[in-house]
């Protein structure tokens, strides 16, 4: 896992009706009287504002009812057209919800006072404690999140945490987490499961999947810069090649560009010994793709559908982020390494092409 990620949860699960559905949300905010605090939910990428209250004496209170918990945000805005500022994220559920600092040691504002919000706050505190040890933090937090998903596989906490973090886990972990959920949730995460199952097919030890010119529907064909067909199979079967690295990249991708010096060093040193690179670009337009190839001196093989993320190779190799790469042994047709970064490419070639 390469990143430390903060929890952002969302949701939905059923509770009883009647008086138990009443909720209050209270908090303090250093702001002038009359400033509005908004309660909003998220639908896709859009915010849906469902209520607002005015600050009075540096405090605000929302009151309402709900028959099912849902994920929401408290926001402020400096004007109608201004970008909203986050006050807190919370679960709206029956009970008295308080927005406050947990303590002086953990000054970040959290929602507490009801079961789901208390669970989220507890997980947040555990994460902060783990982050004190920077060396072990990333793996420990990943483990904490995954264990929390499994422990809450039957409720909103686990489902939301999975949505926020699934791309950090190994394919089998994703499959196992979904399998632990109720049937209805498994159906909602069907595409995640299918992607994880596909990712299992391109782990080291598996045969490569050919990359061809075929587009899907109206999807553009995957072609070379001069508009020709260059299948990955033809590169593997070229007797001059012993090892081929499939490199998924794009000219607009900063991390991809930072890998270029390392790829060039490995290519210049080992190309004549049988090392080839087959670059698959996720560029949207031809001009920046071709410009990057020319200006950066990327003198290896290149193909692209010039269609951003919508290309068959991306799905076949279960690529969720770039840069991504897969090293194939031409003699066996099998993938022998993945996600080589920095000097790892050159070191791997030194090991293989002594």
What is the meaning of each model-derived region?
Residues 248-265, 282:
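Conserved redox-active cysteine motifs that mediate thiol-disulfide chemistry
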Residues 221-244, 269:
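A short beta-strand-turn-helix
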Residues 1-28, 354:
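Bacterial Sec-dependent N-terminal signal peptides
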Residues 97-102, 138-219:
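N-terminal targeting signals for export/organelle localization
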Residues 296-298, 305-354:
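Thiol/disulfide oxidoreductase modules built on the thioredoxin-like
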Residues 273-288, 298-309:
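Thiol-based oxidoreductase modules, predominantly thioredoxin-like and allied folds used
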Residues 17-148:
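A non-transmembrane, solvent-exposed segment enriched in polar/low-complexity residues
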Residues 239-244, 272-275, 297-300, 331:
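Loop/turn elements at helix/coil->beta-strand transitions in domains of secreted/extracellular proteins
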